[in-house]
C-alpha cells in the first residue's frame, strides 16, 4: 500500500476539484486522482465560459443551491484573488408557453428573483445585434453572467493543496474494491487505502460505478466561436449571455459576449452552442472532429439570431454531456455502502453548481447527510 487517506476522490474536474477543496478545508486527509491534466479538453468543463443564473428554468428546486453556489464562488474569489465570475446579465427568449420561458417565470416567482420583460423596441435599443422572433417573449435576468471554468477548477485545486490535499494528475484509476471497512484503489501508478470514496468521474463514471452507468448516456456536443463584424457591440461590458429558442427549429441555443483572448483564456470570439442533447457516444471514442455540415448549421443559427454579423469561424470544440434519464443531477450515498459517495448525470447544466456540489459531497462524506436541499437529486429516483 502506497498511502492511506480519509477520502480518495476519483476524478478532479468540475465536481471533484470542489469536493477536494471542501474536504481538505475540513481537515480530512484527501487524495484526488485525475487521469488527465487537471484542466483538459476531453470532458465537460473546457471552453472558457459557463453561464450561471438563478431564474432556473430546469426546476425551481435548484434555486437554493444556486444561491449558495454564488456565495461560494465569491468566497473562492476572495481566497485566491482571482476573477472567476463576470456579471453580464442574461437574456432569455422563446415561446411564452415553452419549458424555457415558463420555467424562468416559475423559478423567478417562487424565489423572488428579479427579472425584467423586454419588448422588441427595448431589445433593439439595449442590445442592437439581436434579431429574435417577434412572437417570442424576452426576459432579462440582471444577476446572471458567466464563470471561467478552467480558472475555477485551478482555484479549487490550489486551495485544496493549501489545505493539505494531495492532487495527482495523469494517474488513471484501474479499479477499486472494498477492503475491511474502507477501500483499496488501484491506479497505473500505485495502490491507496481510503476510508471513504467520492466518485466524480463525469463521462467516465460508468467504468467505476456500473449500477449508475446504466442510467446515464454520454452525448457529443459541439461548440463554436465566431468572429463578428462589430465586435465592440458584443463586449462583456455591452452584451449579455443568452438562451434563445430559434424560430425555425425551436431548439435552444446559448451564447456569451465576445471574449478577448489573453483576458479570458486562449480562445476568442462569440461562443455559441446548442443546448439540446447531441449524438450518444462513448467518452473514449467520441469523434472530436467538427464536420462541415455542423459548421454550416451553426452559421445559419448565428445569422438567424445576429443577422449581418457573421465574419468567420474562429474555433470549434467537442465536449461531452452526461445525461440522467430525467436530466436532473444524481448526488447520493450508495444505499449499499455509506462510505461510497457519488455525483453524476449533470446533463449539460452542472458547472455553475460545482462549488456547492463540492460542499454537499463533503457533507455526505463527513456526516452521511447534508443540510442543503438535495433530496430531489437522490439516486432513489432510478436505483
Regions found by a protein language model. Give the residues of each.
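Beta1/beta-strand and adjacent pyrophosphate-binding region of the FAD-binding site
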Residues: 2-13
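N-terminal Rossmann-fold NAD(P) dinucleotide-binding loop
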Residues: 16-17
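Active-site substrate-recognition segment that forms the wall
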Residues: 21-25, 81-85, 191-192, 196, ...
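Glycine-rich FAD pyrophosphate-binding loop
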Residues: 24-45
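Dinucleotide-binding Rossmann-like beta1-alpha1 core, especially the glycine-rich loop
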Residues: 49-126, 135, 253
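Short beta-strand to alpha-helix junction loop
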Residues: 64, 92-100, 140-159, 287-294
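Flavin (FAD/FMN) cofactor-binding core of flavoprotein oxidoreductases
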Residues: 121-125, 146, 280, 292-355, ...
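Helical element adjacent to the flavin cofactor pocket in flavoenzyme catalytic cores
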Residues: 141-196, 200
Amino acid at each position: 500500500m502506497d498511502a492511506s487517506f480519509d477520502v480518495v476522490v476519483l476524478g478532479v474536474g468540475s465536481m471533484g476539484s470542489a469536493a477536494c477543496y471542501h474536504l481538505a478545508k475540513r481537515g480530512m486527509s484527501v487524495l484526488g486522482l485525475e487521469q488527465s491534466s487537471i484542466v483538459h479538453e476531453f470532458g465537460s468543463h473546457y471552453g472558457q465560459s459557463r453561464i450561471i443564473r438563478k431564474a432556473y428554468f430546469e426546476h425551481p428546486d435548484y434555486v437554493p443551491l444556486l444561491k449558495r453556489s454564488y456565495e461560494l464562488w465569491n468566497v473562492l474569489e476572495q481566497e485566491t484573488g482571482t476573477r472567476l465570475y463576470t456579471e453580464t446579465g442574461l437574456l432569455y427568449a422563446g415561446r411564452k408557453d415553452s419549458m424555457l420561458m415558463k420555467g424562468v417565470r416559475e423559478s423567478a416567482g417562487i424565489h423572488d428573483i428579479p427579472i425584467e420583460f423586454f419588448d422588441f423596441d427595448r431589445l433593439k435599443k439595449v442590445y442592437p445585434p439581436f434579431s429574435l422572433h417577434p412572437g417570442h417573449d424576452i426576459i432579462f435576468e440582471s444577476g446572471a453572467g458567466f464563470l471561467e471554468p478552467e480558472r475555477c477548477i485551478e482555484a479549487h485545486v490550489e486551495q485544496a493543496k493549501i489545505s493539505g490535499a494531495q492532487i495527482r494528475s495523469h494517474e488513471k484509476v484501474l479499479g477499486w474494491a472494498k477492503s475491511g471497512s474502507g477501500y483499496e484503489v488501484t491506479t497505473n501508478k500505485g495502490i491507496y487505502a481510503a476510508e471513504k470514496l467520492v466518485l466524480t468521474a463525469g463521462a467516465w463514471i460508468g467504468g467505476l460505478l456500473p449500477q449508475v452507468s446504466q442510467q446515464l448516456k454520454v452525448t457529443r456536443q459541439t461548440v463554436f466561436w465566431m468572429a463578428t463584424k462589430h465586435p465592440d457591440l458584443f463586449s462583456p461590458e455591452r452584451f449579455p449571455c443568452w438562451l434563445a429558442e430559434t424560430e425555425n427549429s425551436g431548439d435552444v441555443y446559448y451564447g456569451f459576449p465576445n471574449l478577448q483572448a489573453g483576458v479570458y483564456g486562449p480562445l476568442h470570439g462569440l461562443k455559441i452552442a446548442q443546448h439540446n442533447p447531441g449524438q450518444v457516444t462513448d467518452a473514449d471514442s467520441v469523434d472530436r472532429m467538427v464536420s462541415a455540415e455542423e459548421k454550416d448549421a451553426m452559421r445559419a443559427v448565428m445569422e438567424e439570431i445576429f443577422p449581418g454579423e457573421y465574419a468567420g469561424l474562429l474555433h470549434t470544440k467537442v465536449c461531452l454531456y452526461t445525461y440522467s434519464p430525467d436530466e436532473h443531477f444524481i448526488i447520493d450515498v450508495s444505499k449499499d455502502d455509506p462510505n461510497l459517495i457519488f455525483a453524476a448525470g449533470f446533463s449539460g447544466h452542472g458547472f455553475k453548481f460545482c462549488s456547492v456540489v463540492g460542499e454537499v459531497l463533503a457533507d455526505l462524506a463527513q456526516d452521511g447527510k447534508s443540510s442543503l436541499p438535495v433530496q430531489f437529486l437522490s439516486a432513489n429516483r432510478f436505483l
